[in-house]
Curated annotation (Swiss-Prot):
Protein name as it appears in the record: 4-hydroxy-3-methylbut-2-enyl diphosphate reductase
Binding sites annotated in the UniProt record for dimethylallyl diphosphate: 41, 74, 124, 225-227, 269
Cofactor(s) this protein cannot do without: [4Fe-4S] cluster
Species name: Salmonella arizonae (strain ATCC BAA-731 / CDC346-86 / RSK2980)
Root EC class: oxidoreductase
Keywords of this entry: 4Fe-4S, Iron, Iron-sulfur, Isoprene biosynthesis, Metal-binding, Oxidoreductase
Function according to Swiss-Prot or TrEMBL: Catalyzes the conversion of 1-hydroxy-2-methyl-2-(E)-butenyl 4-diphosphate (HMBPP) into a mixture of isopentenyl diphosphate (IPP) and dimethylallyl diphosphate (DMAPP). Acts in the terminal step of the DOXP/MEP pathway for isoprenoid precursor biosynthesis.
Catalytic reaction equation(s): isopentenyl diphosphate + 2 oxidized [2Fe-2S]-[ferredoxin] + H2O = (2E)-4-hydroxy-3-methylbut-2-enyl diphosphate + 2 reduced [2Fe-2S]-[ferredoxin] + 2 H(+); dimethylallyl diphosphate + 2 oxidized [2Fe-2S]-[ferredoxin] + H2O = (2E)-4-hydroxy-3-methylbut-2-enyl diphosphate + 2 reduced [2Fe-2S]-[ferredoxin] + 2 H(+)
Catalytic activity, EC: 1.17.7.4
Amino acid sequence: MQILLANPRGFCAGVDRAISIVENALAIYGAPIYVRHEVVHNRYVVDSLRKRGAIFIEQISEVPDGAILIFSAHGVSQAVRNEAKSRDLTVFDATCPLVTKVHMEVARASRRGEESILIGHAGHPEVEGTMGQYSNPEGGMYLVESPEDVWTLNVKNEDKLSFMTQTTLSVDDTSDVIDALRSRFPKIVGPRKDDICYATTNRQEAVRALAEQADVVLVVGSKNSSNSNRLAELAQRMGRRAFLIDDAADIQEAWVKEAVCVGVTAGASAPDILVQNVIARLREFGGGEAVTLEGREENIVFEVPKELRVDVREVE
């Protein structure tokens, strides 16, 4: 059985930054550090940080006065930000800079009183945070997930309308929704390209190349990870058996028993140690040496806040 690895896969710059913010805060200030929502959607990462003293909460009211609070990589609404500001808290923002860029687009539309449409998945924390940047009662903020949603949407003024997208969507699905928006609202204005981030786009491109060669695809990522789910869906659409797994223990031998080639990738919030564990498990099932496919090089780095720019090893 051949083992192929998608390239790129795993951590993106926004996830790296968010985890570093929590790790550095723990090293500098000591436990406990409070984090609103899971800092990234990965069980292994969250459990590891929890063991070191991070406390994950959903409501600001759960944070005691004088504590350190970190916003997750998914971002928060303006209401949450204001609530935190009204409290005696030291706040660090781990929102991915590419999510912040979308927040700024929404805030700009809100100031102008222009209506905005967000393409995204209802209930996802990134969507809640992005929708929460809009506050102008003269305009309006709407969420659509599919072309069908677009055709049933009613707005106040079709001449002053813009759209944005969640950063972790399916590139293909989003293109279909944008086509519907432009057809329904010919004067709608959007970003030069959609707001789907480079890492999401690159990992979908990589899993497409992987699925062309593999007959089974394993996606390492947690069930609540939007970008990981999109990778598994894409492989399935290409006619491959694809499974979303948290770690190597989830793999069932029956999935790969008849496989000639198994492809492995990982969502943007999944650490490489989980991929290595999956490779080891596949080798127990008769897999050979893992071969990494050629792919797009990524060299983007997002800096942590200057107050947290320390060598954690020195602090420890």
